C-alpha cells in the first residue's frame, strides 16, 4: 500500500466548464474509490446517482452517495465514480482512478509512472 498527496479536480461531465477547485487528496492504493468533499462536488453540478456501503478500518459500516465525474490529477484524467465525502471523511484518490489514469505508483519518489494500456486479445474473450 502506498499513500502520498496530490492535487485533484473533479469536472462535471455534462458541463466541463463546471469543476471543483483543486483538492489535496491522498493517493491511497488501499482504497478502491476516490472521495472528494460533498459540497464541492455539488457546487460543480455533479449529482449523486446512488449509494454505496463501505466497511471502514475501524470496523464501522457507513453509506455514502456516489456520482460520476471526470477526475484530473498530475496531467492525467479519466471518467470515474466519485464518492461524496462527508466532513468527517478523508479526500482520496483510489486505485480505480489510478487504473483509469493508466499509471502505477512509485512509493519512493511519490509520483505516478505512466504504464501502457494492455489490450485483451479477441481470442481470450471467445
Regions found by a protein language model. Give the residues of each.
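Pepsin/retropepsin-fold aspartyl endopeptidases
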Residues: 1-126
Amino acid at each position: 500500500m502506498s499513500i502520498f498527496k496530490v492535487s485533484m479536480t473533479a469536472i462535471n461531465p455534462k458541463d466541463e466548464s463546471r469543476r471543483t477547485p483543486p483538492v489535496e487528496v491522498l493517493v491511497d492504493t488501499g482504497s478502491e474509490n476516490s472521495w472528494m468533499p460533498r459540497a464541492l462536488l455539488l457546487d460543480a453540478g455533479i449529482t449523486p446517482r446512488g449509494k454505496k456501503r463501505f466497511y471502514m478500518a475501524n470496523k464501522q459500516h457507513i453509506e455514502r452517495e456516489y456520482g460520476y465525474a471526470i477526475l484530473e490529477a498530475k496531467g492525467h484524467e479519466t471518467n470515474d465514480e466519485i464518492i461524496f465525502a462527508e466532513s468527517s471523511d478523508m479526500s482520496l484518490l483510489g486505485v480505480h482512478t489510478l487504473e483509469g489514469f493508466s499509471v502505477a505508483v512509485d512509493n519512493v519518489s511519490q509520483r505516478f509512472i505512466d504504464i501502457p494500456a494492455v489490450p485483451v486479445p479477441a481470442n481470450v474473450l471467445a
